[in-house]
Amino acid sequence: MRDALFAYSPKGSNNLYELAALGEKTYFIDCPTRIGIYRINDTDVCLIDSGNNPDAGKKVLALCNEKGWKITHIINTHAHADHNGGNAIIQKRTGCRILANCYEQCMITHPRLNNCCTFGGRTPMELDNKFMLAESSASEQITDENIPEGLSFRLFPGHSFDQIAVMCDDGTIFTGDILCGKSTIEKYHIFFIRDAAEYEHSAKEICETEAKVWCAAHYPPIYSKDELCELARLNIEKMHELLNVIKEICADGKIFEDILKETLDHYGLELSFNQYAIAGSTVRGFLSYLHDIGEIAVDIKNNYLMWRNCDGETN
């Protein structure tokens, strides 16, 4: 999800769905949500994510058929619809196994849970679209035993509940949405974060990994540790900027809808329904985080839930 809506778009439509090499065994398919490929052997491959909709799945199937490759596995970094939109059609045509982690695995099998988590309840029909709601696919909990040989995984939550990165034995790491791309940050300022504390921790942790290349879903591959760490720094810096903006907005106590509006106005944003739901989820999560660390208080007045900055208060 969610970076498909606040996201990098591949430059040059002629390059869409072309195969590009990363390492000795790894490739990516350039498309709105990049699809990773790990070559298990001469005939079998594992996908890392499956694209943002069924059409992406069809194009990946055609490409793999052309190469003589059989898709035996899909590993989803997380459950957002832009990362598993091709799951169902690929699984129907190949019988491949789909592996994901904990909550992500559950939400891939039951995708409406994902939208409920974002919106905070049953979603209106306008949000039941291909950008927000993937078709259900049968997924399994990923383990060290069922992941294809040559691959491993590691937990990097924050953007989503139980997002993982996929580590390949040729030095490639597929990072999903652990970090947001620079162009998206500069254009939209607000990007999807489920948990601020976990997001910052994961941004720092990915900088501790060793790889030849880090391949994310929504921005070009990174081949330099310094470049990766600079992007992580930018993500953390922007997140804290947004937290401070929200704190300032809450100086006199405000309801959520006013906080969200003033945050969007601060950055000069006018959003679609999809984007509004996503930005709203991020801002709600930030309010909860600020409350839990004691920087924002919650009051109920006249049946309004008010969020109020605690600066200057003493116990």
Task: State what each model feature region is.
Residues 12-67, 165-176:
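Conserved beta-strand hairpin/beta-sheet module of binuclear metal-dependent hydrolase folds
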Residues 236-254:
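Positively charged, polyanion-binding regions of nucleic-acid-associated proteins
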Residues 52, 152-240:
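Metallo-beta-lactamase
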Residues 26, 54-147:
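Active-site HxH/HxHxD metal-binding segment of metal-dependent hydrolases
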Residues 33, 42, 52-53, 81, ...:
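Short, glycine/acidic-enriched loop or turn micro-motifs at the edges of active sites
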